[in-house]
A protein has these predicted regions:
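Residue-level hotspots at or immediately adjacent to binding/recognition sites across diverse folds
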Residues: 1-355
Length: 359
């Protein structure tokens, strides 16, 4: 997602790269690029003028926002035939960190005199599945298949924080401010990383397990400050609140199966916000799911709904559904506090006061 939030770059197999309107994904265009790459990850430069996309066999391309042209980056030979899995620009855009299979990480920048690319020291041996940099500081987090979670400081030093043995698949850091990041593992663990901006090597990490959930985590992204969305396989979505340290269901797989079994067979590959409580999810089939608060839910139910609209790339609307939040009173109360109207919030506050008096 671009720094301005109005453009999304999508990528995947067969060298496919799409420019997508963040507010209306039906407005999209496939960019011209010939090749056989499978692109795995991409990131916008903080300046917003270009994006880097990386993939298998050391593939690395630059997408220019001025004319949406795609070109190979200089110095790509440094990566050899490594499968590149992750990329992130640091806070001020001075360096990009690129992670690959077998624990390899490079720091890279492109100067007038040519590429400046270096393999980093202190590496692990397992795949670097995700890299995420904080917006405010030149500090980045690294998550791996079994070497744990690492942090890169402004001097390009990699230190390992913990979480060894967990199959970490994704990490997300605040979009604007804050220094608390969230990482997830495929076996349903959530790590909260409190980044120390003055000495990143002593950053704190806490891990909680969510064994009762069905399926596996496959990634996450920030929805708004303090809130991230965790995608799961089979197709489902939960929210994790940093301030509360808890997770809540948004879209359950049973809802997806009931309304569209083909969608339920797909995988969530990414999401982005359009406001605090709304946004889009992109699926592995090239479709999009729009979610936003439902305005006309019967107040007597005491819970809110999320409107879901499914569209296909270049296609038409396939379906719409209302996925109600869980009937759990705890979750219903939390959802009401988050996105309820004023009357619902007042009613919820009264109910919570009554409950506290009984305890």
């Amino acid at each position: 997602v671009s720094p301005s939030g109005d453009l999304v770059i999508g990528y995947g197999a067969e060298s496919s790269i799409f420019a997508i309107d963040a507010s209306n994904p039906l407005n999209n265009s496939k960019l011209e690029w010939s090749g056989e790459e499978i692109f795995q990850d991409g990131d916008f430069h903080p300046g917003g003028l270009s994006a880097l996309v990386v993939g298998n066999d050391g593939a690395a391309v630059r997408v220019a926002m001025s004319n949406f042209s795609v070109s190979s980056v200089e110095g790509g030979f440094y990566f050899g035939q490594t499968e590149l899995l992750s990329i992130s620009w640091n806070g001020d855009g001075s360096w990009a960190y690129i992670g690959g299979e077998s624990g390899l990480i490079w720091r890279a920048r492109w100067l007038e005199e040519g590429p400046d690319i270096h393999q980093m020291d202190g590496l692990g041996g397992s795949d670097v599945n995700s890299i995420e940099c904080l917006a405010k500081w030149n500090i980045c987090l690294v998550v791996t298949s079994f070497d744990g979670i690492g942090v890169i400081n402004s001097d390009h030093e990699l230190n390992w924080l913990g979480g060894v043995g967990y199959p970490w698949v994704g990490v997300a850091c605040p979009i604007i401010n804050g220094n608390t990041c969230v990482a997830v593992s495929s076996d349903k663990n959530v790590a909260m990383i409190e980044v120390n901006p003055y000495d990143p090597s002593v950053s704190g990490i806490g891990i909680v397990s969510l064994p009762d959930l069905e399926g596996q985590f496959n990634g996450l992204s920030f929805q708004s400050e303090g809130r991230s969305l965790i995608s799961m396989t089979p197709f489902s979505l939960i929210e994790h609140s940093i301030s509360m340290g808890e997770s809540y269901p948004w879209i359950e797989n049973s809802d997806a199966i009931e309304f569209d079994s083909e969608m339920a067979d797909g995988r969530i590959v990414g999401s982005w916000p359009t406001s605090e409580n709304s946004g889009w999810v992109m699926t592995s089939f090239g479709g999009f799911v729009h979610f936003s608060p439902k305005e006309d839910v019967d107040d007597s139910k005491g819970i809110l709904g999320i409107w879901i609209i499914i569209v296909a790339v270049g296609g038409v609307t396939l379906m719409s559904l209302s996925a109600l939040a869980s009937s759990s009173t705890t979750i219903s109360s939390w959802v009401t506090r988050k996105i309820g109207n004023e009357e619902e919030k007042k009613r919820d506050a009264r109910n919570r006061r009554k409950k506290s008096k009984k305890q």
